[in-house]
Amino acid sequence: MTEVLLEDLDHVGPATAQKLKDAGFTTIEAIAVASPAELANSAEIGESTAAKIINAARQSADIGGFETGDLVLERRKLVGKLSTGCTEFDEMMGGGIETQSITEMYGEFGSGKTQIAHQLAVNVQLPPEQGGLGGSVIMIDTENTFRPERIAQMVKGISDKHGIEYDPEEFLKNIHVARAFNSNHQILLVDSANELANELKNTEMPVKLLIVDSLTAHFRAEYIGRGTLADRQQKLNKHLHEILRFGDLSNACVVVTNQVMSKPDAFFGDPTKPIGGHILGHTATFRLYIRKSKGEKRIVKLVDSPNLPDGEALISVTTDGIGDA
């Protein structure tokens, strides 16, 4: 199939094509799923022109129409599964972490969210026969928790597990980390992630995993009090949809960690609740609640999924990484 260039679209001349590329809209698919207002503001073109360009892109990319369930099922075969490194965890997730979806992990401090994120950053680089996706990683670090030393320990762990001597430095070269200093910066980094994914698209290591650790930390710190709640949720909602679009366009896994709060008025059940409210609850495809157990063991509970039953998996967090308990 011949790749359609931006210049081939109706209403797009060389100057407009350059504006679109400069704004981060480098593919037909990216334009097809944008809104007219978003395209107009980003590329500095009129909103009516933006609407015409989007319609042309949708026709070209065959996006936006109805399709039968069997075609959806056929397309679902392109969805990849990333192994967590733990058999019980993988089985609960139907084979691993899915591409083209958001997997949210929430739990108290020290529950192992960042540890699992680090492990996935290693595992995704492995070939499919070893549970990986043969791709690189983009990590948006909001809490300064990325540790290359921990990656090196985990690479040693998988070297011992598979009986193959892997080089930690090679793994680190394929992890692209950016520190987000506030919520606006965090949102902008998703645009940068799209650009990087396009650059690496046809290389040996295309981007197959986006990690945001933690998704809600900056939003929680910057928007204080009920008076700012509506603004915070609107901004978070837009951010989540940008992240989800990244996963769709790159056929990549999207893993976000989330902080929790305690509800002191909860007399029955677990008082621990994730930050982000209903907006995050509706947008995340899979929700995982991680809590501490005895020693190095952790319990991972699948709280929400569109196609899998609720379940629990026992994992262990050791020097070698995440594994069977």
Curated annotation (Swiss-Prot):
InterPro entries linked to this entry: AAA+_ATPase (IPR003593), DNA_recomb/repair_Rad51_C (IPR013632), DNA_recomb/repair_RadA (IPR011938), DNA_recomb/repair_RecA-like (IPR016467), DNA_repair_Rad51/TF_NusA_a-hlx (IPR010995), P-loop_NTPase (IPR027417), RecA_ATP-bd (IPR020588), RecA_monomer-monomer_interface (IPR020587)
Pfam families from the UniProt entry: HHH_5, Rad51
> Per the UniProt entry, what are the Gene Ontology biological process annotations, in alphabetical order?
DNA recombination; DNA repair
One GO molecular-function entry: ATP hydrolysis activity
Q: Which UniProt keywords apply?
A: ATP-binding, DNA damage, DNA recombination, DNA-binding, Nucleotide-binding
Matching entries from PROSITE patterns are given as: RECA_2, RECA_3
Q: Which family does it belong to?
A: Belongs to the eukaryotic RecA-like protein family.
Name of this protein: DNA repair and recombination protein RadA
High-level lineage? Archaea, Methanobacteriati, Methanobacteriota, Stenosarchaea group, Methanomicrobia
